[in-house]
Amino acid sequence: MSSSHHRRSRETSHAEMPIGRYTRLDEIGRGSFATVYQGVHTKSRTYVAIKSVNLSKLNKKLKENLSSEIHILKGLYHPHIVALIDCHETTSHIHLVMEYCALGDLSLFIKRRDTLGDHRYTQDMIAKYPNPRGGALNEVVVRHFLKQLASALKFLRDRNLIHRDIKPQNLLLCPSPSSYRSGVAQVVPFKGCDESFSPATGLESLPMLKIADFGFARSLPSTSLAETLCGSPLYMAPEILRYEKYDAKADLWSVGTVLYEMVVGKPPFRATNHVELLRKIEKGEDRIKFPEENPASEQIKSLIRMLLKRNPVERMNFSDFFDCDTITGPIPGLIADDAPSTSRRSSVAVNTSGSTSRPQSRTGSRTPTGMKREKDASYPGKKDDQVSYPAAHRPPTQRSDTPPASSPMRRMGSGDRATTSKETVTTTPRRPSVVSLATAPGRQELVDRNATAAVMERQRSRNTYAGVPQTEKQAEKTKEESERAAQEIAFERDYVLVEKRAVEVNAFADELAHSPRIQGGFPRNAYALSRRPGTQGSSTATATSPLATTGKAMQVASGRARADSTHTRQGSYERRYGQSPTSAISKALHMASGRLFGMGFSPPMTITKGGRSPPLGYNPFPAYPAAQGSLMVVGDGARTNVTLDEDAKTVQVIEECATRSDVVYGFAEVKYKQLIPLAPSVQTDPSGRANVPGGERDSTDLTDGGLTVDAVVTLSEEALVLYVKALSLLAKSMDIAGAWWSRKNRGEAFGESAMGRTDATSTLVSNRINNVVQWVRNRFNEVLEKAEFVRLKLIEGQKRLPPDHPSHPSNHSVGPSVGSGASTDVVVSSGVTAEKLMYDRALEMSRAAAINELTGEELSGCEIAYVTAIRMLEAVLEEEEVSRSEPGSGTDRGDARRDGDKAMLDGVRMEDRQVVIKSSIFIVTRKQSSFVLP
């Protein structure tokens, strides 16, 4: 929002760089995979934004996927979508030339609402519609932005496209169209089409909203991962946070969160990670509260509440949203100058007619047939660009009679094809089914219902479509579906290796949570709110819908135990193991952590720096809401069932394994939290200047968080190996629970329950195991995301090291461990192993606790330190247990080499290590048992 563009990005100024017909200027933003620059058209001197994507982070298939998506996006033009104008590829980057939005994004617009009256682009808006006290933006401005957002979403919806990442940071703002006409806005942007800066709805005297970055979430999944870990899931629908299958209604939840933030000034739910966020959403039970002093109208509040329904079935649908009075009706409270005129076109006409959509895909000829290009005197670069734009206000009947060229990844239905003049519908238009994504396949019942609703919506549409011969349409549809399926399969094979493991874990947790045996006699109404019985102590069970059971572990723990909570589980510190089946999860995690994260290990030779462990206030494992009393006193008291004793042992083994994983997770969190400030989240102010910490500091010496590159690499390596260790322990917990569940399904453990003598006991055991499984599932998903974030940080850090550094990629002696491309491989420095880090830290904690006990300092934390050290040492031994339990046929040669490396660590054989560790456990356990608080 600066009027002096020569001052833009003084700290990050780069030499001008020609990119096709454009010149790249200064940097205005930075992300995890791309850098955004301001650019200018070399002849027209109009401004563009150039997004330079680093190809080194994309493997071959992802590059092909991105190219297909780009071809589709080039054919989508709408006034409220940031247009992709051009694309240039070099050996190292893909440069995406996009429309330039001078006012920045909506999030900064809201944050700096108190200073908008001082800026030349927005001072007239604030003079007419001042921001209210107790609120964020004036309701006139809120409704104006909402209308434009709905217009863009309807355009996407008619083409069966889902954005999946609607948030204020992806809603960019341009100066009002009237400011361009009056000359107030001096920076003229390059037009993607004739009506790029002519609003389809809303007011011409207010800033114009455009959706950005749609369609890239799937092609560039590293962004969603980095953003997820840095705080952007604040706007994600709960079904996505629960790792459930979802449809386009996820966008409506995001619209509700954005609308709430425009009204209140902050998101409706705030948390530091997606696990805590989901817990808060579930705890809220659809009760959306507004500050008492907030002046928002009841109509706006009601719309927000209908959009922010946890259950997508109960959420407002697209038809109702597009037809509601807030979207279709006039904006109340307008001043006389902004009163609507009869000549203004309606948003619905623009959305459904597609007059702003380029009628021909750029994959074919750049000049559409059957349509003359109209000259635009205000657009001098048009002839040189050889790009066709639709005529302004062109009615639907003037479309080209030549269908657009087909694209391999084209997502448009038959209704989106060009029509012949003045022809009407001859066949019922049908929207293609929702695209099943690699990260979230489409849920069948929602897909079917969605398709039915789409037909009804099309019948009510004002649009007219040409009839397409049935045989031709069917053949083309079959070809498109087969090509799209091939693309989906190839994409999943190359990228979503981790996701498949998460799917297995989530599938078992879903099965257990929805089983009638687990639910017992509890109500099974699909939409009724039910409360967990038997809460203990002060724990409050959260009322949730059974459909949201996949996230019920949020009720159990938020992932971080409170320092003031009491660890009530009195499990023995002796090692008890159940028979762990060799499931796909355990096998995959043990066989190749590298297969999950692209990791290869150098032979361990020397030990690098260790790290600080969790603080003494860290509680290893959260208490469950179900009663934790003795299982032996529940039932009829007549006799004890042998299978009941086995169930009790199973519960204890699962809990102890989960506890060990939680201790390792806590250790990894210490490393991870030191990397969080390094997340690529450089923000730009409304003027477009990049806020780069450190000014002109050499980025190779210090990172944004003040850590050296060496420190970043060390922390990333240690966090990564610890997260992988935590995953293996979590997978083992799931395996033990899976074996128990298999026995239950075979009837081996339900012989007595049919007679009614152990129903209460079986229900208690089942609920207790279900609680652990749900907790493990959510922790597993969280660790997967954090491990991927750390992996990317490690790759980035290693590339920034000096070329002669041993950890620089050019000096790695171990070959790639994953066949998806060298860009995804990671090699950890010699000597960095989770077992060594854990062993050193356990001894450090126990020694510190012993000293504190002798000196009488911090006695309250001594027992916690002893218990944590014991669990960490037991987790070290867990590696040997897993290694011996896995058959040799299930491992590959790379794992055999790693096992051989582990047989000798620092000159100590495996058997000797076990003796040393077990001796340490015995000593610490004895010390802990003798510890008594004064």
Curated annotation (Swiss-Prot):
Reaction equations catalysed: L-seryl-[protein] + ATP = O-phospho-L-seryl-[protein] + ADP + H(+); L-threonyl-[protein] + ATP = O-phospho-L-threonyl-[protein] + ADP + H(+)
One GO cellular component term: Atg1/ULK1 kinase complex
Compositional bias (Polar residues): 340-368
Basic and acidic residues: compositionally biased ranges: 371-386, 561-577
Domain of life of the organism encoding this protein: Eukaryota
UniProt-listed SMART domains: S_TKc (SM00220)
EC identifiers of the protein: 2.7.11.1
Record localization: Cytoplasm; Preautophagosomal structure membrane
PANTHER family to which the protein is assigned, alphabetical: NON-SPECIFIC SERINE_THREONINE PROTEIN KINASE, SERINE/THREONINE-PROTEIN KINASE UNC-51-RELATED
Family the entry assigns: Belongs to the protein kinase superfamily. Ser/Thr protein kinase family. APG1/unc-51/ULK1 subfamily.
Protein name: Serine/threonine-protein kinase atg1
Source organism phylogeny: Eukaryota, Fungi, Dikarya, Ascomycota, Pezizomycotina
Gene behind the chain: atg1
